[in-house]
Amino acid sequence: NTFTCCVGSGIENHGKYAEQIYSHDGKNTLWVNLFIPSVLNDPANKWVLRQETDFPESNRILFLLDQKNKEALNLKIRMPYWAKRMDILIDGVMYKRLPDSSGYLNLGSLARGKYRIVIEPEMELYTEAMPDNKNRIAFKYGPLVLAGQLGKNMPDPLYGTPVLLTDNKNLKDWIRPAGGPLQFELNGVGKPNDVKLAPFYKTYDQFYSVYWDYFTNEEWSRRQNEYEAAKKMAAELEARTIDYFRIGEMQPERDHQLVASEKSYV
């Protein structure tokens, strides 16, 4: 029930997205940047492009183009960095295209007429590591960050957030579907237990974790005592801490009613 700057930014985002769904060079080239249901109507150039999709719930994106200009429209669609391939059907015919140097698939010159274009960027699981720690990773599926569901009660500070323990480097063996769209779960690699994974944007009203520490069995046998001792020390310090104030961050300074001027900082 708070209204912080984060909430305002979250609301503002949607307006910003609308600014960038499409780009046009003012002539006959149109770029599709984002996959968001929308209608682009350009009376001056005599074409209308409708985009229909529930992405990322589904990877199917439909474009309905009504092109009435005598000059052909050059249509380019962004191929996301996370997509290994992207199927393209124009009026039911499959086309193969490679992205250009800017990462866009050129559908070619579309003459006057109506077109039904379907694209399906392939979404798959992969990991992304912290810049300073290659063994602290996040799980991603296409553009989505997956969060581990830790329940409504505060997890145990030592063992509530699992580590990943396996010698198997094949990510597809770590995670399996969990019965619903965009729902996954760890598969025998969580220590002390596996957890369910869901898109971060759908995770609320519970505790969660996004980053996971990964160990091989040999690394864990060497570091287990050290790792658990560090977590125990952090938990004990937190239990003894009355307050924690991060100077230089807006929200903590407001929470602590800090009054300062430019002379207050060194």
Q: What does each model-identified segment do?
A:
Residues 56, 68-70, 100, 110-112:
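Surface-exposed coil/turn segments at beta-strand junctions on protein surfaces, enriched
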